[in-house]
């Protein structure tokens, strides 16, 4: 019985960890946040500001891991960049 409870607890913990999202950060216009001419570590800092676990410059835009669900990330299906 203790083993079953431990197993279920582990599954719940894994479910909590997996719920983090990842993706390209967006600027105020809905475009991917550019890192083309930014200094090294810029994307990592921007991701940390958004409460992400890490990030890097996936040329030419910032890509983040471990973002909370409330952070909006760029999506091809809902892309509004450059459109009015």
From Swiss-Prot:
Localization: Secreted
A single MF term (Gene Ontology): sodium channel inhibitor activity
Ranges where the LCN-type CS-alpha/beta domain occurs: 21-82
Domain of life of the native organism: Eukaryota
Signal peptide: 1-20
Modified sites of kind Cysteine amide: 81
Family matches, as Pfam families: Toxin_3
Keyword Ubl conjugation on entry: no
Gene3D superfamilies from the UniProt entry: Knottin, scorpion toxin-like (3.30.30.10)
Keywords: Amidation, Disulfide bond, Ion channel impairing toxin, Neurotoxin, Secreted, Signal, Toxin, Voltage-gated sodium channel impairing toxin
Main location: secreted
Any single GO BP term: defense response
rRNA-binding recorded as keyword: no
Matches recorded under InterPro entries: LCN-type_CS_alpha_beta_dom (IPR044062), Scorpion_toxin-like (IPR003614), Scorpion_toxin-like_sf (IPR036574), Scorpion_toxinL (IPR018218), Scorpion_toxinL/defensin (IPR002061)
Tissue and organ expression note: Expressed by the venom gland.
Cellular component annotations (GO), alphabetically ordered: extracellular region
Disulfide bonds: 31-81, 35-57, 43-62, 47-64
Family of this protein: Belongs to the long (4 C-C) scorpion toxin superfamily. Sodium channel inhibitor family. Beta subfamily.
Domain notes: Has the structural arrangement of an alpha-helix connected to antiparallel beta-sheets by disulfide bonds (CS-alpha/beta).
Task of the protein: Beta toxins bind voltage-independently at site-4 of sodium channels (Nav) and shift the voltage of activation toward more negative potentials thereby affecting sodium channel activation and promoting spontaneous and repetitive firing. Is lethal to mice.
Protein name: Toxin Tb1
Organism name: Tityus bahiensis
